[in-house]
């Protein structure tokens, strides 16, 4: 997204493009004067406040404002318009408002406006800002929809949403008939959901000639997008200030040392302005944070305070905004240093940034379909990302970009464009969605960048193993219900299985806790022992999934027994737990429970703590995660994946790592190939239980290994009726599916 617009709040009454629909005067001179004294807001019929005019002056200073007339002309005459502009030009806040004016001028006969964002933080903050600029109420005329939170009504004119939420809406409303204008923002981020929408909307536009599509992107992607939609018109917005770029003259030796040195050189120089540092990964953020805080504590007070802000995009509250004016008046000068990664490029919304330090590298998650695991790959950023980081300084006449790489590296080693997530991600959820919206022939869907055939085949294979597909390759009844949950298909399958195994309550808690950000806080140096002591009180001998239930239940007990929210926050702080993550888990769980009730799935009363309940939870987990099993091959915690020859260790925060008791077989929620190869969220399972639940056609396809032989021997010790029942359950025959699926 792109916001100098969020820093600016002042000019003459706005000259609207559709005066005939917005004018409230008779036309006589006296009436016009009266109308100007009390101009009415056409969106709610109330007089404009003084703040509206103050913000209007700021809007008119945005680079995009001078393109309003040409944009409105293009909108009237074309079905698709591409808006190309730098990340501080104002397109994310102004274009949706102009589209709302267009919809108002035609009396909303084709619907309202929806604008997608790649990040939920930007969707929320843009909605708040635009509601303020339009002088209307947030949640009424302007609202937002993000995962597990809907701040809209049926009367909402302009909605901001995350791209995945608009994608999910297509399951129930494939042609998006509620909207007259759809705006895809931040397309240059190439998120999976945005790329899917780009492809699907081509068909929607053919079916709905009255629908308008606006595509906002950075300049480097403009020509590709214009030709993708058939040489559509492009509105180009230029920023006004040049930026000084400083490259390294020689090879990079130590990026951490260079970053730390630059931060303090800038601070001691006396030049005003905040600093943004782009690092490769979150671990680098933590390391840099500690080093800067440690060295900053020894600064001379005369140079001013240095406030270090780690910006983690996964956290809901992470957003870097301008300092409030009242805050400025109450404090001495402070220079803020924001530490972030490439994921934070869209989250910097402050015109006070005067310096950007760019290491030129990022650690990306790249999915390997052959081993069904993500690899963390350190690689150069793209030229388009480097340009976006430069654009953060576009509003500053004296901004400086320090590139900790050579100019030759930028031209030869950096790719022109950021890789599409579709070419690097696990596509199982996407394929489930495409099947749900009944897109015939995935290979023929017109994606801007086609996904790898191997990734598509692996996704289809996994859905088949999960019983989400029938014999014809269409969605089974299981698959249709799985697609109702905004979760990974494996997690959705585990929830469905829990309906049969009478442990829905516990499974919903597990699903919410693994979907929300980690509830365990990053522990500062020196406090590790105290944190582990606190966390030991939550440990469960059956594994990490059960430990998460203990944490959630303890949080719920604290909420019920606390006098106020502050007491809950203090409890979380004392236990080294993230209060915001636990609140998010609570919200997610409530929505999942609502889905269970809406589609009338059976819901058993909680029975957590009993031996039978523990076994049932593991059965439900195995029903979805039978492809994520590992065995300790040497008794020392070296776990070999069942599906391939990768060796991993349990994460240090695992209950087994803390108690030093390593089970032989574990089911795990997450594994990434990286320096440490950690398995995250693991629980012990037995070979016998695994063989009861695993689909036989999946097991037969496993490569030969010692682990497979051990499992085969375990199956030989099972009662014959158990094995036969399992084969019936896991067979792809529709009749067998109906026998097991008591929820149908």
From Swiss-Prot:
Indicate where this protein is primarily found. nucleus
Could you tell me the EC number(s) of this protein?
A: 3.6.4.13
Residue numbers of N-acetylmethionine PTMs? 1
Xref: InterPro entries: DEAD-box_helicase_OB_fold, HA2_WH, Helicase-assoc_dom, P-loop_NTPase
Q: What positions carry the motif DEAH box?
A: 185-188
Residues reported to bind ATP: 85-92
Keyword line: Acetylation, ATP-binding, Helicase, Hydrolase, Mitochondrion, Nucleotide-binding, Nucleus
Q: Where is the Helicase C-terminal domain?
A: 258-438
Q: Which SUPFAM superfamilies match?
A: P-loop containing nucleoside triphosphate hydrolases
Q: Which residues form the Helicase ATP-binding domain?
A: 72-270
One GO CC term, this protein: nucleus
Tell me what reaction this enzyme catalyses.
Answer: ATP + H2O = ADP + phosphate + H(+)
CDD domains attached here? DEXHc_DHX32 (cd17977), SF2_C_RHA (cd18791)
Name the SMART domains on file. Answer: HA2
A Pfam family that this protein carries is OB_NTP_bind
Q: Which domain of life is it from?
A: Eukaryota
GO molecular function, a single term: RNA helicase activity
Q: Give the matching PANTHER family.
A: ATP-DEPENDENT RNA HELICASE, PRE-MRNA-SPLICING FACTOR ATP-DEPENDENT RNA HELICASE DHX32-RELATED
Name recorded for this polypeptide: Putative pre-mRNA-splicing factor ATP-dependent RNA helicase DHX32
Gene for this chain: Dhx32
């Amino acid at each position: 997204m792109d916001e100098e617009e969020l820093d600016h709040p002042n000019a003459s009454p706005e000259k609207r493009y559709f005066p005939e629909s917005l004018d409230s005067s008779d036309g006589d001179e006296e009436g016009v004067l009266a109308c100007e004294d009390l101009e009415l807001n056409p969106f709610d019929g109330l007089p404009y406040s003084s703040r509206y005019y103050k913000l209007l002056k700021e809007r008119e200073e945005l680079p995009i404002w001078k393109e309003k007339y040409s944009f409105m002309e293009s909108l009237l005459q074309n079905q698709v318009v591409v808006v190309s502009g730098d990340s501080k030009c104002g397109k994310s806040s102004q274009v949706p408002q102009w589209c709302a004016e267009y919809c108002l001028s035609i009396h909303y006969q084709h619907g309202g406006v929806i604008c997608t964002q790649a990040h939920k933080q930007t969707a929320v903050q843009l909605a708040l800002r635009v509601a303020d600029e339009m002088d209307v109420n947030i949640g009424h005329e302007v609202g937002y929809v993000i995962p597990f939170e809907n701040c809209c009504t049926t009367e909402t004119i302009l909605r901001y949403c995350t791209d995945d939420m608009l994608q999910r809406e297509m399951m129930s409303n494939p042609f998006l008939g509620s909207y007259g204008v759809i705006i895809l923002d931040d397309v240059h981020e190439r998120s999976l959901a945005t790329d899917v929408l780009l492809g699907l909307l081509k068909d929607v536009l053919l079916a709905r000639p009255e629908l308008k599509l606006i595509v906002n992107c950075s300049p480097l992607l403009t020509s590709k997008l214009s030709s993708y939609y058939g040489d559509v018109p492009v509105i180009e917005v230029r920023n006004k200030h040049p930026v000084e770029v400083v490259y390294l003259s020689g090879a990079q030796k130590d990026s951490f040392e260079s970053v730390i040195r630059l931060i303090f050189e800038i601070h001691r120089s006396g030049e005003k302005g905040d600093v943004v540092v782009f690092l490769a990964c979150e671990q680098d953020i933590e390391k840099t944070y500690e080093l800067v805080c440690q060295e900053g504590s020894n600064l001379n007070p005369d140079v001013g305070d240095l406030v270090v802000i780690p910006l983690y995009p996964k956290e809901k509250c992470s957003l870097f905004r301008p300092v409030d004016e009242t805050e400025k008046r109450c404090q001495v000068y402070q220079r803020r240093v924001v530490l972030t990664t490439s994921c934070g490029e869209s989250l910097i919304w402050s015109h006070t940034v005067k310096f950007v330090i760019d290491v030129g590298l990022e650690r990306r998650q790249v999915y390997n379909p052959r081993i069904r695991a993500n690899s963390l790959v350190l690689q150069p950023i793209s030229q388009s990302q480097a340009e976006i980081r430069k654009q953060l300084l576009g509003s500053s006449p004296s901004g400086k970009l320090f590139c900790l790489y050579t100019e030759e590296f930028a031209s030869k080693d950096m790719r022109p464009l950021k890789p599409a997530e579709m070419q690097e991600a696990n596509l199982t959820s996407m394929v489930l969605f495409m099947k749900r919206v009944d897109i015939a022939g995935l290979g023929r869907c017109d994606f801007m960048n086609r996904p790898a055939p191997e990734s598509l085949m692996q996704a289809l294979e996994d859905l088949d193993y999960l019983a989400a597909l029938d014999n014809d390759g269409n969605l089974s009844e299981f698959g249709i219900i799985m697609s109702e949950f905004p979760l990974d298909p494996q997690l959705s399958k585990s929830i469905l299985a829990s309906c049969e195994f009478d442990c829905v309550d516990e499974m919903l808690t597990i699903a919410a806790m693994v979907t929300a950000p980690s509830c365990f806080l990053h522990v500062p140096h020196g406090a590790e022992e105290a944190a582990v002591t606190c966390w030991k009180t939550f440990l469960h001998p059956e594994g990490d999934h059960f430990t998460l239930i203990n944490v959630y239940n303890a949080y719920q007990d604290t909420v019920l027994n606390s006098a106020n929210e502050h007491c809950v926050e203090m409890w979380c702080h004392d236990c080294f737990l993230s209060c915001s993550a636990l609140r998010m888990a609570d919200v997610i769980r409530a929505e999942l429970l609502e889905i269970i009730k809406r589609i009338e799935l059976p819901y058993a009363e909680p029975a957590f703590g009993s031996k039978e309940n523990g076994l049932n939870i593991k059965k439900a987990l195995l029903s979805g995660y039978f492809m994520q099993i590992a065995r300790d091959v040497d008794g020392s915690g070296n776990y070999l994946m069942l599906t391939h020859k990768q060796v991993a260790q349990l994460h240090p925060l695992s209950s087994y790592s803390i108690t030093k008791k390593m089970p032989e077989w574990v089911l795990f929620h997450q594994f990434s190939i990286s320096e440490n190869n950690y398995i995250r969220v693991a629980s012990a399972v037995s070979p016998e239980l695994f063989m009861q639940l695993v689909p036989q056609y999946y097991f037969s396809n496993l490569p030969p290994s010692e682990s497979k032989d051990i499992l085969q021997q375990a199956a030989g010790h099972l009662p014959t009726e158990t094995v036969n029942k399992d084969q019936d359950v896991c067979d792809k025959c529709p009749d067998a599916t109906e026998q097991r699926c008591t929820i149908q």
